[in-house]
Amino acid sequence: MEKAIRNFLSQESAGGILLLVAVALAMLMANSPLAGLYQGFLGTEVQVRVGALDLHKPLLLWINDGLMALFFLLIGLEVKRELLEGALSSVAQASLPTFAAIGGMLVPAGIYLLFNYGDPVTQAGWAIPAATDIAFALGIMALLGSRVPVALKVFLLALAIIDDLGVIVIIALFYSTDLSTISLIIASIAIVGLVALNRKGVTALAPYGVLGLVLWVAVLKSGVHATLAGVIIAFCIPLRAKDGSSPSEHLEHSLHPWSTFLILPVFAFANAGVALGNMSLNTLISPVPVGIALGLMLGKPIGVMLFSYAAVKLRLAQLPNGIGWKQIAPVAAMCGIGFTMSMFIASLAFEQADPMYGDLARLGTLIGSILAALIGYFWLSKVLPKQGV
């Protein structure tokens, strides 16, 4: 039994399976007699007081602001590694996934705005279908095992990382609220300290952790979303020490299982519970869920393929060795798996609006992501060579 559990946890697909279980459990509880317990649990006030510092938020916001900051720390570490040493470290390697990611963000956002034209409240959700859930997309691809060429995995990983970088910029520019000058000054001082540690060649993670915590609290209080603190911390942690070791990769490897098996499933459970009982057919086909679902299911693959094809034809990029358009197309469909990232943006976009909009956004995300996952999986399975061929 223990061996079976260890084998499951070692598989790349395990994270995607756990996310599905978390989503299913959240939907079950939100649409059962346990709905009150589910909502009450997420609404539980949690207070942390240290001297004059007093933080009190519902559990849901601790998950979205705290746990997701750790997830974005991991994303930041991955982005930095790929930019300096990995699949994005040269123009030739980065060109195709960069153009693909840009198209995969612009076209879904355009489709969403097309359906929500003229409504300033719902237009705030334009970035929801622009996101890709890197963990879930790679998990779905991993279900096909060794049939998937390494170059195709690298393409999806690079594309998703650039997509994440785009999401980080979007959050910073478009989803920050009224700013606190004092908190921003404290955050700036913490950033200067983190940069100084990096420049001095400090490789111990503890000093980065202390200043990082100060930065997170300051950013949380500043009006800029707290998850951005995780990215800043990641960019300041050294990739290589003088002895050749990598503090950044060590932390990345330590965070990966926590992210896969705790942070993302907990986030999905906390945010995916949509009560369907009070929704009519007209509500289900309203502009918000339709715009998100079509943005993910159609906009993502169209944008990725259109911009990739144009970049190759204009000789701005080239296809990976041994990979053709028939393999790129189903991967483009998989990019429509928005899940946790899209839900996260939805929580920011409609934070001040009627809760109904958040429910509609999550519903659209679930529908679009599940359809994108199914289409991408079966399409890729069809075009890849059979096992042993």
From Swiss-Prot:
GO terms under biological process: regulation of pH
Alphabetically ordered keywords of this record: Antiport, Cell inner membrane, Cell membrane, Ion transport, Membrane, Sodium, Sodium transport, Transmembrane, Transmembrane helix, Transport
Primary location class: membrane
Record's keyword annotation contains ATP-binding: no
Spans through the membrane: 17-37, 59-79, 95-115, 124-144, 154-174, 177-197, 213-233, 261-281, 287-307, 328-348, 363-383
Locations listed in the record: Cell inner membrane
GO cellular component, one term: plasma membrane
The reaction(s) this protein catalyses: Na(+)(in) + 2 H(+)(out) = Na(+)(out) + 2 H(+)(in)
GO MF term list: sodium:proton antiporter activity
Membrane topology: Multi-pass membrane protein
Stated family: Belongs to the NhaA Na(+)/H(+) (TC 2.A.33) antiporter family.
HAMAP family attached to this UniProt entry: NhaA
PANTHER family: NA(+)_H(+) ANTIPORTER NHAA, SODIUM ION/PROTON ANTIPORTER NHAA-RELATED
Function: Na(+)/H(+) antiporter that extrudes sodium in exchange for external protons.
Protein name from the UniProt record: Na(+)/H(+) antiporter NhaA
